[in-house]
UniProtKB/Swiss-Prot annotation:
Belongs to the gamma-glutamyl phosphate reductase family. Signal peptide: none annotated. This is Gamma-glutamyl phosphate reductase. Its main location: cytoplasm. HAMAP family: ProA. It catalyses: L-glutamate 5-semialdehyde + phosphate + NADP(+) = L-glutamyl 5-phosphate + NADPH + H(+). The gene is proA.
């Protein structure tokens, strides 16, 4: 164990040392590194898929659920998507060096801000091997060194991906030590990593509530967490039913295992009888299980062939990550807002309505990272928000909120231009 602890300290030290030349690397160099990464992924597809197959085999043997298994799978198509996302990050404007908020003071000093990298970012994450590439690419583009610590369930995939990333970075003339990967997945080592505040500037955990809570409680380093998503859609009395059905279907079914998938559907009582049987019929085609409150049960028990069970108390406020939806009929917009305030996680909430006043109340009163009107909750995503890939979706209010793109992993320094001024 002592050897493993020393190895982590050395990786952090190397990342810190590499962060300095990386911080002033040219945009062309950083973009070349990202393009190299994309090419390496595609050129080494057979080896990556073989490593991922090992992860799948071990995960199945360990009894991993289908929802969790889907998160770790890499297919040729998904690998091509990861490479495409990396190229998209390369094509984004480089935030480093941006000058903003410049003002001339009465004494003639010109004062403003210059955007700079944070330094070294440690990413602690679970399940998804694409996160290894996404986070490395974003950190490099923003001039940050990165320490990657994935979960044991994707160790084979992450190991080869990290090796290829380091190779691609070095081929672009940047220090490969700017990307560090911790192969030892022992839980106790995370605790040690979280104490290295002299080398690491920010920790980003991505995963379940247990991981995020552990990191927040044990870190000596600032943390920006990609929070869990307990996501609601409220179908207002003035909703367009066709739009509401499409939005509820897409939000639940398109990819149910991700944090921006809908968990709870709130429906105004005046539209429930017309709307619920239609959406339930569509959901039933995809195998969605509905956990309904008493009023929704009465409407749906004879209306469709959907999987229908009474909602339990703990179904409200639950992130299902599966083809399961809690459904509740509410008396008013006020009740919907109160329900979301009590059970929401601050991730994404959406209203479907044609009533402008209701939409504005929802936008103003819901406290979440992303609040939507007449749109699927699945849009809360870095690429959909024009940020490229993301490091996570923060449900915090400091330092970043919502999808975390390039600017969210930079800071700034004050710059001052003088002409011989002295303070009297």
């Amino acid at each position: 164990m002592e050897k493993a602890l020393l190895e982590i300290e050395e990786k952090a030290r190397l990342a810190k040392a590499a962060s300095r030349p990386l911080s002033y690397a040219s945009s062309a160099q950083k973009d070349a590194a990202l393009k190299n990464i994309a090419a390496c992924l595609l050129n080494n597809a057979p080896a990556i898929l073989e490593a991922n197959l090992k992860d799948q085999t071990e995960a199945k043997a360990a009894g991993m659920t289908a929802a969790m298994l889907d998160r770790l799978i890499i297919t040729q198509s998904r690998l091509e998507g990861i490479a495409k996302d990396t190229l998209a990050i390369a094509a984004l404007p480089d935030p480093v060096g941006e000058i903003f908020d410049m003002n001339t003071m009465p004494n003639g000093l010109v004062i403003g801000k210059k955007r700079v990298p944070l330094g070294v970012i440690a990413a602690i994450y679970e399940s998804r091997p694409n996160v290894t590439v996404d986070i490395a690419a974003l950190c490099l583009k923003a001039g940050n060194a990165v320490i990657l610590r994935g979960g044991k369930e994707t160790i084979h995939s992450n190991t080869i991906l990290a090796r290829l990333i380091r190779q691609a970075v070095e081929e672009a003339g940047l220090p490969q030590e700017a990307v560090q990967f911790i192969e030892n997945t022992e839980h106790s080592l995370v605790n040690h990593l979280l104490k290295l505040s002299d080398q690491i500037d920010l920790v980003i955990p991505r995963g379940g509530a247990g991981l995020i809570s552990y990191v927040k409680q044990n870190s000596f380093i600032p943390v920006v967490a990609g929070g869990i998503g307990v996501v609601h859609i409220y179908v207002d009395a003035d909703a367009n039913i066709a739009d509401a059905v499409n939005i509820a279907y897409n939000s639940k079914v398109q990819r149910p295992t991700v944090c921006n998938a809908m968990d709870t559907l709130l429906v105004h009582k005046d539209i429930a009888a017309a709307f619920l049987p239609v959406v339930a019929a569509e959901w039933s085609k995809a195998g969605v299980e509905i956990r309904a409150d008493k009023t929704a049960m009465e409407i749906l028990e004879n209306a469709s062939s959907c999987k229908l069970i009474p909602a339990a108390a703990d179904d409200w406020g639950k992130e299902f990550l599966a083809l399961v939806a809690a459904v509740k009929v509410v008396d008013s917009l006020d009740e919907a807002l109160s329900h979301i305030a009590r059970y929401g996680s601050g991730h994404t909430e959406s209203i479907v309505t044609q009533n402008y006043t209701s939409s504005q109340r929802f936008l103003n009163e819901v406290d979440a990272a992303a609040v939507m009107v007449n749109a699927s909750t699945r849009f809360t995503d870095g690429s959909q928000f024009g940020l490229g890939a993301e490091l996570g979706i923060s449900t915090q209010k400091m330092h970043a909120r919502g999808p975390m793109g390039l600017k969210e992993i930079t800071s700034y320094k004050w710059i001052v231009y003088g002409n011989g001024q002295i303070r009297g």
